Amino acid sequence: LTPAAALKVSTLNFLHRVRPTHFLKKVLMTNRNPEALQAFAGKVSNSVTGGLNCALTMIGDQLGLYRSLAEKGPMQSGGLAEATHLSERWVREWLYQQACIGQIEYDETADSFFLSEEGKAVLAQEDHPAYMGGMIQSVVAMFDTVEHLPECFRSGLGQSFDDKGEGCACGIERMSRKFQTDYLVPALLPRLDGITERLTAGASVADVGCGGATSTIAMAKAFPASKFIGYDISLHALERARANIAAAGVSNIKLHNPTVDPLPEDSSIDFITTFDVVHDSTHPRQLIDAIKNSLKRDGSWLCADVKGLPTFAENRRDNPMATLAYSFSVLVCMSAGLSTP
């Protein structure tokens, strides 16, 4: 059998083993609405498939499989394994899964695999606005923490960002990197009255919840006369920030952990930024008050945060991102916000 034929046969055999026709018919017949039961079971099955695919997509991202396909074009499993210095058998099975789910294209005649232009953008080109490797990485990093969620539900206390591990911090940093490096300084800051002029002249800036400091670095490079302080309570994020700052070669950034070195209360800061921070805060009112007290009377606060609709009913009906947003909330955002009493 060719690999393509073997894939079809093995898939059919697997489906026959796990879902025998006579058994499925019997189950459906016991339900008053077998079509609805089958549709609902299919919906849940798709969710299971999506969860498994997240893990395998992260593998493709971390091992450079997508990048190699994007750069070298159509390849058979042996060629991709050789290009990435990986085991052919493992690469072959991964390619079969990726082709079945539709993330990688398959040419039966040539028995080769390749990425569409859309696939390259979403899976291989980290500088593309549609790239999703960071999101996938952060989602997979949450898997290890799921076993702790039952206790969160019982106690009401959530998990901090550091409880999610370094992978979550890295994934979130990668998710926001494109905006912070390519959009923040050239496109967003000029829309704020007087900000670029003030930063050019030299200002005191606090990037609160700086994460890996990609936004801090972008501003520090563009405005060398200004002094920047990145604040974050995540030790994983601060470690990444130190490494990123060193790699960028900027000298006008300092890093503080606000649990040790909080924002100043002397109204000495010209400009404060928060990017997707307030909704994750354990005490948002205290954070807002601290920001207010640290700003000069003519200072400015750039607050970018999650955009939702006023009610759950509206979000469920009209917000296409509602499912993703609520999923992230339970696993990360609300959990972090409830991580301290």
Regions picked out by a protein language model, each given a short descriptive name:
Residues A304-P341:
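C-terminal alpha-helical "lid/dimerization" subdomain adjacent to the S-adenosyl-L-methionine
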Residues D270-P284:
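A short SAM/SAH-binding and catalytic strip from SAM-dependent methyltransferases
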Residues E35, K43-S68, R92, Y96-A203:
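Conserved Class I S-adenosyl-L-methionine-dependent methyltransferase catalytic core
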Residues P74-E82:
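Short acidic, hydrophobic short linear motifs in intrinsically disordered regions
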Residues G209-A213:
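Class I SAM-dependent methyltransferase "Motif I" SAM/SAH-binding loop
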Residues D261-I272:
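A short acidic, Gly/Pro-enriched loop at the edge of an enzyme's catalytic core
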Residues A206, T216-D261:
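Class I SAM-dependent methyltransferase SAM/SAH-binding core
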